[in-house]
Amino acid sequence: MTKSELIAQLAERFPQLVAKDADFAVKMILDAMSEALVRGDRIEIRGFGSFALNYRPPRVGRNPKSGEKVSVPAKWVPHFKAGKELRERVDQAI
């Protein structure tokens, strides 16, 4: 599901919500979540899952084209862990 599909589904499910308002709400939620991760905060949405940052240490990688060794710097990457309720719902549905 894309962001625009999510906005369309919200507008369809809640007729009192104009598509423009649904668009604004989704953008504000995603912006708030992004800002929290940039600050290093953990985001927990009960029943859905949590977002946190994982540290990836520096390593030596390989250029797949030439095979030469390449230094890959350390970095922080966003990580999502599905909550128990979400895992169970997906498992039952599939």
From Swiss-Prot:
Acyltransferase keyword on record: no
GO biological process, any: regulation of translation
Keywords: DNA recombination, DNA-binding, Transcription, Transcription regulation, Translation regulation
Family matches, as Pfam families: Bac_DNA_binding
Family matches, as HAMAP family: IHF_beta (MF_00381)
Subunit field text: Heterodimer of an alpha and a beta chain.
The protein's name: Integration host factor subunit beta
Species the sequence originates in: Dechloromonas aromatica (strain RCB)
Source taxonomy: Bacteria, Pseudomonadati, Pseudomonadota, Betaproteobacteria, Rhodocyclales
